[in-house]
Curated annotation (Swiss-Prot):
PANTHER family: LEUCINE-RESPONSIVE REGULATORY PROTEIN (PTHR30154), TRANSCRIPTIONAL REGULATOR AZLB (PTHR30154:SF34). This is Uncharacterized HTH-type transcriptional regulator y4tD. GO terms for molecular function: sequence-specific DNA binding. One of its GO terms (biological process) is response to amino acid. Disulfide bonds: none annotated. It holds the Pfam family HTH_24. Residues 37-56 bind DNA. Residues 18-79 form the HTH asnC-type domain. Gene3D superfamilies: 3.30.70.920, Winged helix-like DNA-binding domain superfamily/Winged helix DNA-binding domain (1.10.10.10). It comes from Sinorhizobium fredii (strain NBRC 101917 / NGR234). Keywords: DNA-binding, Plasmid, Transcription, Transcription regulation. GO terms for cellular component: cytosol. The lineage of its organism: Bacteria, Pseudomonadati, Pseudomonadota, Alphaproteobacteria, Hyphomicrobiales.
Length: 169
């Protein structure tokens, strides 16, 4: 995924070249990436071979970053979700890079954003219970001298969870 992040200029140029068939394919696979080539062909009006060729190109360009299943945290014993606002002690490139690396290497962090505003990072974290989250905060936040502070919001209800991006041409 690191390579995908480094190709933003290519993706921005490519976004201008998406045609209706690409958009239809992307919208279809964002909803269900288990559709067969024949089912995709019916939805977008192309042959199954053309659909596969286009999907391969979209993957190679990084437009499609991954083909994954979205797993319910609750179903696998991680029913507690937190949104955590993290502020760094100083905003220096080496500190930011070090914290980004720690986010990538920490299994409890599902999503991490480097942001502007009141915090430096927003994290989505899951835990099996609050005791496990407390242990995580001690290890991940309190033992890290680069962190000035953090604020936790506990999610009461997951109203919507999707990675589908609205696409228009």
């Amino acid at each position: 995924m690191q390579d995908v992040c480094n190709s933003q200029e290519i993706l921005q140029d490519y976004a201008m070249e998406l045609d209706r068939a690409d958009v239809a394919l992307l919208n279809a696979v964002q909803k269900n990436n288990r559709l067969t080539s024949e089912e995709l062909a019916d939805k977008v009006g192309l042959s199954p071979t053309a659909c596969q060729r286009r999907l391969k190109r979209l993957r190679s360009l990084g437009v499609i970053e991954a083909d994954v299943s979205i797993v319910s945290p609750k179903a696998v014993g991680r029913p507690v979700t937190m949104i955590v606002m993290v502020s760094l002690e100083r905003e220096r490139a080496d500190i930011v890079d070090r914290f980004k690396s720690s986010i990538r290497n920490t299994r409890e962090v599902m999503i991490g954003y480097y942001v502007t505003g009141d915090a430096d990072f927003i994290l989505i974290v899951t835990a099996k219970d609050m005791e496990e989250y407390e242990e995580f905060t001690r290890r991940f936040f309190y033992e890290n001298h680069d962190i000035k502070g953090f604020k936790t919001m506990v999610v009461m209800d997951r109203v919507k969870a999707t990675f589908a991006v609205p696409i228009e041409i």
